[in-house]
UniProtKB/Swiss-Prot annotation:
HAMAP family associated with the record: tRNA_methyltr_TrmB (MF_01057)
Its biological purpose: Catalyzes the formation of N(7)-methylguanine at position 46 (m7G46) in tRNA.
The protein, known as: tRNA (guanine-N(7)-)-methyltransferase
Single GO cellular component term: tRNA methyltransferase complex
Enzyme Commission code(s) on record: 2.1.1.33
Keywords, sorted A to Z: Methyltransferase, S-adenosyl-L-methionine, Transferase, tRNA processing
Amino acid sequence: MTQTFADQKRKTVETAEFTEDGRYKRKVRSFVLRTGRLSEFQRNMMNDNWGTLGLDYQTEPFDFAKIYGNDNPIVLEIGFGMGKSLVDMAFANPDKNYLGIEVHTPGVGACIAYAVEKGVTNLRVICHDATEILRDSIADGALGGLQLFFPDPWHKAKHHKRRIVQPHFVTQVIQKLGKNGFIHMATDWENYAEQMLEVLSANTDLVNTSKNGDYIPRPDFRPLTKFEARGYKLGHGVWDLYFVKK
């Protein structure tokens, strides 16, 4: 079978890095590339609509005003899954521009398909490692906010180093946020919620909007996700955190 653009995309979600003596440098990644296959429909949606809804990793900052055709705030969501809640938020907030990052191509294809169905134009998606996008493709101060909903909890203690929410990640995000930019996280793992709260609270550039100094109720503007519904079924709680850059 001929390899299409969508098929090739899965193989280029991160840039290979090497040591000075030419050996491949292993990275501690917050994601694992699952083997889920693109459906024919998802493949076609990616191939047909990438030019209008997709962005590729680049080593210089995106020109968001040119990409979106306006200067509306940019809200970045990392790990949007199948993309339904992201598209719903973009549809409900035409005064904001949304940028979604997801490394799993079936999710990217599904997100694009739903965006086309809803007629959403204020959304772009990227299929690449988020840490590289933050490092290379987004200018300092360019973002209005970051959304991180139900990231992989890596629940085993020996895997906690793989969790995306680490001090260096938060520092990197803050650098990309403009003044009063927000960080909104949600998880259905209490241990991860505690880690998120600890890491975010330790950064003096952020202010917690919770009146109690911890978590907030799910705001109406965040759609109920399938991961959240799954958590409720398993008897898990759900914790939202909302911090603002000083």
